[in-house]
C-alpha cells in the first residue's frame, strides 16, 4: 500500500529532474552555440565574406542599367529584366540568415552548411577524431541513449496492467500520448519541412505556388501515408489473429470467444497478467472454471467479454505498431548522432545529450503503451531494448556514408524524404487511435485532471526539447 501511494511522487520527482536537466542543457547549448559561432567566424567567415565581396563587386562593376546576360545572373536562373543586383543581394542575405538560424538551432548542421560554401573548411573539422575513436564515441553514445531510458524504467512502480496500477498507468498513458503528438508535430514534421522551405526561400524569383508547394505537399502525403499504413497493418493483424473469433463471438458457441482469447494471449502473456485479469473480472474466471457448461449464466456476459477481448487485441497490435514507429525514429536518431560526431567531439556530445533528453520521456511513454497492451514490465523492457538496434544501424549508416552526407541531412531534418513524415504519421495514429481512447474511460474528477495534466506534460517536454535542438 505504501508503495502504491508513493508512485505519483516518484513520477513527479522524475519529471522535475528531467525538466531541470533540460534547462541545464539549454544553458550549455547556448554557450556551445556561441563558441561554435566564434569558431565559424574564424574558420569560414573570411572565405564567405570574400565570396560576398566578389559577388557584390561584380554587380557594381556592371552597373545598374546593365542587361542580365552576365555570368553571375546566369547563375541565378537568368531573369529577363533588370534587378540582378537586388536578386543577388537578397539571395546572399537570406543565405547568411539561414545559416545563422541553423547554427543556433541545429549544431550538427555546421558540417553541411560549410560544405555548401566550400570544402576547405570541412576536412579540418572532420579530422577532429580518428576513425577508431570516431566509431567508439558514436557507438558508445548510441548505446548510452538506448540504455539510460532502460534503467529509468526500473523506477516506475508499474508491474502489469492490473487494477492497483491502473490509475498510475493511465497517467503514464496520457503522458505518452502527449509525447507522441508533440514529437510528431514539433519535431518530426518541422524537421521534414525545413529543407523544402529553405529551398523555396533561396529562389525568390520563382512563384511560391508552383515550386514551393510540391515538396511540402509530399511531406503531408507521407504523413497521411504513415497513418494509412498503420491502419492497414492493424486491420490485417486483427483479421489474422482475432477476426474469426470476434466475428462469431456474439452469436455462436462459447468456444469461439474463448479461442479468440487464447490467440490474444500468445503475444504478451504472463502469470502476472493472468492473475490480474482474474482479479479484475470475475466472470472471466467463472468461464475458465466452468468451461461454458452453464450457458444461461454465461450468456448475458458473453458480449461484454467479446468486447473486452477486442479492445485487448487492439491494444496489443497498437503496442507493436508503436514499437515499429519507434524503431524508425531511433534509426534517425542514430543517423544524427553519427553525423554530429563526424563534425567534432563537442558537437557529438551536445547532440547526444539532446537526443537523450528526448528519448527518456519517449521511452517512458512507450513502456506505458506496452504494459497497457498486456505485456509485463520485464517483457516491455525487453521489447524496448530491441529498438536500440535501429539506433545502432542509423549510427553505422551515418559513419559508413562517405562524408556523412546522408547523416548530415538526417541530422538537419531532411534525410530520405519519407522517413521523418512517415514516422510522424505512425506516432499520430498510435496516439489518437490507440492511446487517447483509453483516456476516455470513466474516472474520478481528480484522475481525469491528472490525465489531462499528464498529456500537457508530454507536450511541454517536447516543446522544451525542440528549443534545445
Swiss-Prot record:
Record field: transmembrane: 10-30, 138-158, 169-189, 214-234, 386-406, 410-430, 448-468
Predominant subcellular localization, coarse grouping: endoplasmic reticulum
Membrane topology term: Multi-pass membrane protein
Organism domain of life: Eukaryota
Ranges of biased composition (kind: Basic residues): 242-263
Reactions catalysed: Zn(2+)(in) = Zn(2+)(out)
Keyword Phosphoprotein included in the entry's annotation: yes
One Gene Ontology cellular component: endoplasmic reticulum membrane
Localization: Endoplasmic reticulum membrane; Golgi apparatus, cis-Golgi network membrane
Biological processes per GO annotation: B cell differentiation; intracellular zinc ion homeostasis; regulation of ferroptosis; skin epidermis development
Gene Ontology MF annotations: zinc ion transmembrane transporter activity
Keywords: Endoplasmic reticulum, Golgi apparatus, Ion transport, Membrane, Methylation, Phosphoprotein, Transmembrane, Transmembrane helix, Transport, Zinc, Zinc transport
Residues recorded with modification Pros-methylhistidine: 66
Pfam family, one: Zip
Region (Disordered), start-end ranges: 42-121, 242-310
Record flagged with keyword Ion transport: yes
Disulfide bridge partners, by residue number: none
Post-translational modification: Methylation at some His residue by METTL9 leads to reduced zinc-binding.
Family under the similarity heading: Belongs to the ZIP transporter (TC 2.A.5) family. KE4/Catsup subfamily.
Function: Transports Zn(2+) from the endoplasmic reticulum (ER)/Golgi apparatus to the cytosol, playing an essential role in the regulation of cytosolic zinc levels. Acts as a gatekeeper of zinc release from intracellular stores, requiring post-translational activation by phosphorylation, resulting in activation of multiple downstream pathways leading to cell growth and proliferation. Has an essential role in B cell development and is required for proper B cell receptor signaling.
Protein name, UniProt field: Zinc transporter SLC39A7
Amino acid at each position: 500500500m505504501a508503495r502504491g501511494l508513493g508512485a505519483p511522487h516518484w513520477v513527479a520527482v522524475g519529471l522535475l529532474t528531467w525538466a531541470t536537466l533540460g534547462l541545464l542543457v539549454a544553458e550549455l547549448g547556448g554557450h556551445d552555440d556561441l563558441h561554435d559561432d566564434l569558431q565559424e567566424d574564424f574558420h569560414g567567415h573570411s572565405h564567405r565574406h570574400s565570396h560576398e565581396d566578389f559577388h557584390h563587386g561584380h554587380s557594381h562593376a556592371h552597373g545598374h542599367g546593365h542587361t542580365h546576360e552576365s555570368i553571375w545572373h546566369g547563375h541565378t536562373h537568368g531573369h529577363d529584366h533588370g534587378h540582378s543586383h537586388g536578386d543577388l543581394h537578397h539571395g546572399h542575405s537570406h543565405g547568411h540568415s539561414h545559416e545563422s538560424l541553423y547554427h543556433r538551432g541545429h549544431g550538427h548542421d555546421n558540417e553541411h552548411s560549410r560544405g555548401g560554401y566550400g570544402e576547405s573548411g570541412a576536412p579540418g573539422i572532420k579530422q577532429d577524431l580518428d576513425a577508431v575513436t570516431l566509431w567508439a564515441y558514436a557507438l558508445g553514445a548510441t548505446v548510452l541513449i538506448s540504455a539510460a531510458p532502460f534503467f529509468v524504467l526500473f523506477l516506475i512502480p508499474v508491474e502489469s496492467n492490473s487494477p492497483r496500477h491502473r490509475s498510475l498507468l493511465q497517467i503514464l498513458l496520457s503522458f505518452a500520448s502527449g509525447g507522441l503528438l508533440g514529437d510528431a508535430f514539433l519535431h518530426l514534421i518541422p524537421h521534414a519541412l525545413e529543407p523544402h522551405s529553405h529551398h523555396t526561400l533561396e529562389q525568390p524569383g520563382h512563384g511560391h505556388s508552383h515550386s514551393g508547394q510540391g515538396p511540402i505537399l509530399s511531406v503531408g502525403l507521407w504523413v497521411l501515408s504513415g497513418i494509412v499504413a498503420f491502419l492497414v497493418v492493424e486491420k490485417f493483424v486483427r483479421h489474422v489473429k482475432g477476426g474469426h473469433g470476434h466475428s462469431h463471438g456474439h452469436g455462436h458457441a462459447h468456444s469461439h470467444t474463448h479461442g479468440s482469447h487464447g490467440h490474444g494471449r500468445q503475444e504478451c502473456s504472463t502469470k502476472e497478467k493472468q492473475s490480474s485479469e482474474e482479479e479484475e473480472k470475475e466472470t472471466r474466471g467463472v468461464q475458465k472454471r466452468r468451461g461454458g457448461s452453464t450457458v444461461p449464466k454465461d450468456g448475458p456476459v458473453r458480449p461484454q467479454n467479446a468486447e473486452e477481448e477486442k479492445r485487448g487485441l487492439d491494444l496489443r497490435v497498437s503496442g507493436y505498431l508503436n514499437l515499429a514507429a519507434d524503431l524508425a525514429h531511433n534509426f534517425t536518431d542514430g543517423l544524427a548522432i553519427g553525423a554530429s560526431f563526424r563534425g567534432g567531439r563537442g558537437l557529438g556530445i551536445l547532440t547526444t545529450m539532446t537526443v537523450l533528453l528526448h528519448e527518456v520521456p519517449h521511452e517512458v511513454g512507450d513502456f506505458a503503451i506496452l504494459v497497457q497492451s498486456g505485456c509485463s514490465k520485464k517483457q516491455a523492457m525487453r521489447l524496448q531494448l530491441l529498438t536500440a538496434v535501429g539506433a545502432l544501424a542509423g549510427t553505422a549508416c551515418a559513419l559508413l556514408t562517405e562524408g556523412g552526407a546522408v547523416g548530415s541531412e538526417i541530422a538537419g531534418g531532411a534525410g530520405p524524404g519519407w522517413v521523418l513524415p512517415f514516422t510522424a504519421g505512425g506516432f499520430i495514429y498510435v496516439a489518437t487511435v490507440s492511446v487517447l481512447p483509453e483516456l476516455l474511460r470513466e474516472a474520478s474528477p481528480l484522475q481525469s485532471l491528472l490525465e489531462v495534466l499528464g498529456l500537457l506534460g508530454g507536450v511541454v517536454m517536447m516543446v522544451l526539447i525542440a528549443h534545445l535542438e
